[in-house]
Amino acid sequence: MKYYLAPLEGITTYIYRRAYHQHFAPMDKYFTPFLVPHTKKGFSTKEKNDVMPEYSPGMNLVPQIMSNQAESFLHTVEKLKVYGYEEVNLNLGCPSKTVVSKGRGSGFLADPDGLDRFLDEIFKKCDVKISIKTRIGKDDPEEFARLLDIYNQYPVEELIIHPRVQKDFYKNQP
């Protein structure tokens, strides 16, 4: 079994990850809080601190990207490659209403055709491994069969499944 430290916005910053890694049983993989791509500017200081390898020594750190625009996703991957990253994680699990209202995170699951086009483009053009964190649907668990058919078309490094739909947030039974 592998153990991963999932990102919690505002909590699992590089300071938390480093302290955890030094004082507790190390995780097999650590994920950064999600980065929202900005095509016209670089990383903020906070984002840079979270992805700088020297702030996470000895950790298998994977930057998480939240986007519904292939060009922005790919641009962010190029910026991360400068730091030596060979894997990124696509966040399709965040249930926040502000995220979902923009069609990002688990909001992107409501548009399976758009998601398929997005994945097609990023997998054709990206030369790093891509893992995906997903929920089982936006509104109904029955959506997962279609989503799984889409994911199975691509060389996904790893599929991390949060067994709830977006509208459940973090409540109800998984």
Question: Which residues are covered by each model-predicted region?
Answer:
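Flavin-dependent oxidoreductase catalytic cores
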Residues: 1-174
